[in-house]
């Protein structure tokens, strides 16, 4: 149907199809003499022909001489965490704290590295998958890192999402569910952060990786990750303290 819909703009061919979980991307190579603008301006017409809510056209793609046509799938595909874990992108990741983030529009696994961020805000509407994404990131790190490499401080005032991790050896402290205790724990972790900055300064290094290379094995520092579920709610209750 897509080929038929494109036929009236001139000759060309679809050279690649990349199915993703949400959309399928088609690379269309216009024949000589066909203007790219003719294809790019066809979004609404293609959506009507394909009976789709919308069609996104991106082009031209540098170095390929093609235009990408992104068509929403009739049903969104499920992306399983295991698929990302067994992928080459995750298995061969050089990141110290790899995050399995999902798949891109072409169905290729997307893996991030928390140490390269190092702050991360997950935002979205209710029911959009924020908690699922957060749990996937935590599991990604737990999958690869031992307690000697990474430790967590988990703050969960609503007691709904992070309590499942209670008792794992990676915790700096029991999962925090009280807002007052959360403020205390955050002040504590900030104090510890200042101590670490002084330790890095003493060794004349810029990060934990550099510090761990400069000291003996028994003196190495683990990464510390603070995870706060529903940060906005915590700030409303304890705005001054947080």
Question: Which residue ranges define each predicted feature?
Answer:
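N-terminal anchoring/assembly modules that precede and organize ATP-driven motor systems
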Residues: 1-27, 33
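Short beta-strand elements
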Residues: 8-18, 54-60, 150-151
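P-loop NTPase motor-domain active sites and their immediate coupling elements
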Residues: 21, 33, 43, 64-98, ...
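The conserved Walker
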Residues: 61, 126-127
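P-loop NTPase switch/communication element
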Residues: 115, 142-180, 184-185
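Short hydrophobic/aromatic beta-strand immediately N-terminal to the Walker A/P-loop
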Residues: 120-121
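Conserved lysine of the Walker
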Residues: 130
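Hydrophobic positions on the alpha1 helix immediately C-terminal to the Walker A/P-loop
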Residues: 133, 137
């Amino acid at each position: 149907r897509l080929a038929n819909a494109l036929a009236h703009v001139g000759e060309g061919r679809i050279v690649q199809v990349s199915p993703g979980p949400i959309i399928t991307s088609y690379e269309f190579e216009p024949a000589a003499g066909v203007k790219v603008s003719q294809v790019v301006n066809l979004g609404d017409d293609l959506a009507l022909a394909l009976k789709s809510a919308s069609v996104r056209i991106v082009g031209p793609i540098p170095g390929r001489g093609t235009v990408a046509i992104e068509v929403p799938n009739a049903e969104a595909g499920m992306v399983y965490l295991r698929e990302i874990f067994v992928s080459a992108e995750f298995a061969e990741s050089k990141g110290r704290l790899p995050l399995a983030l999902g798949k891109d529009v072409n169905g290729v696994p997307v893996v991030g590295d928390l140490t390269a961020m190092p702050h991360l805000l997950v935002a979205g509407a209710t029911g959009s998958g924020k908690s699922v994404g957060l749990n996937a990131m935590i599991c990604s790190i737990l999958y690869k890192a031992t307690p000697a490499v990474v430790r967590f401080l988990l703050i969960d005032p609503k007691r709904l999402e992070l309590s499942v991790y209670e008792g794992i050896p990676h915790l700096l402290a029991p999962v925090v569910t009280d807002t007052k205790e959360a403020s205390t724990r955050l002040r504590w972790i900030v104090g510890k952060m200042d101590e670490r900055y002084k330790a890095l300064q003493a060794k004349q290094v810029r990060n934990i990786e550099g510090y761990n290379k400069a000291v003996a094995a028994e003196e190495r520092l683990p990464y510390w990750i603070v995870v706060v579920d529903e940060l906005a709610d915590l700030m409303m209750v304890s705005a001054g303290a947080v």
